């Protein structure tokens, strides 16, 4: 069994280089499965894993009081069909009785520009208790905002879904050749995005996203991301990117999994989901996440209904 291979390899030892070496020996699917196993076995994540996989929670719908703020993904207005507006999170939160708001950042804005907006929006919108949920590139927006501000009063937790927190080699590959760079420039221009946006997410050039992402003090951080094998990646371009990134280690079709979370923080990898985090398991997972956040005093408890 894969769980028995590399028995002495703990989660904290799964560096970029170690995962790349394992991938070169055994393939990306093996490395992905091993990384998934080590995340789940890590003592810091066991409570979260147990809570999000609790069979008893399936028959109950959580009821809570508080606010969910969503930092949306890139092009969330132009492409709501890919879930960047957090529709699944909105449904789960509203069903639980929570107030929900999408933070009105620029849909095609750079991380730097959106971070500036968020510094004001978070102080204006946070009430006690509030949970901030960031989606994909929205995690980079939030990360940069927090690097120059303390968490606002009332903010209890930051939930990162498919966090695009660092640069990704997928962008560098697109900007390396003139024809793919031209295609990327056209795609960004079509949605009103500056080419600076691509430069921000370079894994190799100077960028404010190159240094490790750190959790802001005093709030709970929960990282959720897909953990796909090659066959799980759901789009044609996602499969191409997954294959291109596979020599570097486990990835979700857009970013390396080792770059998809903030520490210190709790981590839950969703088996079979890719970067878009869309599987049949997601609605139940989000419902149980709300129950977990209530138990952690990040949201207020209310009467449960069956």
Regions found by a protein language model. Give the residues of each.
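Glycine-rich, phosphate-binding/catalytic loops in enzymes
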Residues: 85-88, 148-151, 175-178, 240, ...
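C-terminal catalytic-base region of ester-bond hydrolases, centering on the histidine
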Residues: 217-306
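Short, solvent-exposed loop/turn segments at secondary-structure junctions
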Residues: 74-76, 108, 137-139, 164-166, ...
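Hydrophobic/aromatic beta-strand patches that form the interior of the parallel beta-sheet core
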Residues: 69, 101, 157-159, 220-224, ...
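Serine-dependent carboxylesterase/thioesterase catalytic core
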Residues: 116-215
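Flexible, membrane-associating and regulatory peripheral segments of lipid-active enzymes
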Residues: 1-82, 91-96, 306
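Active-site catalytic motif of lipid deacylating hydrolases and related acyltransferases
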Residues: 59-130, 186
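Short aromatic-enriched loop/helix-cap "lid" or pocket-rim segments at secondary-structure transitions
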Residues: 81-82, 169-174, 231-237
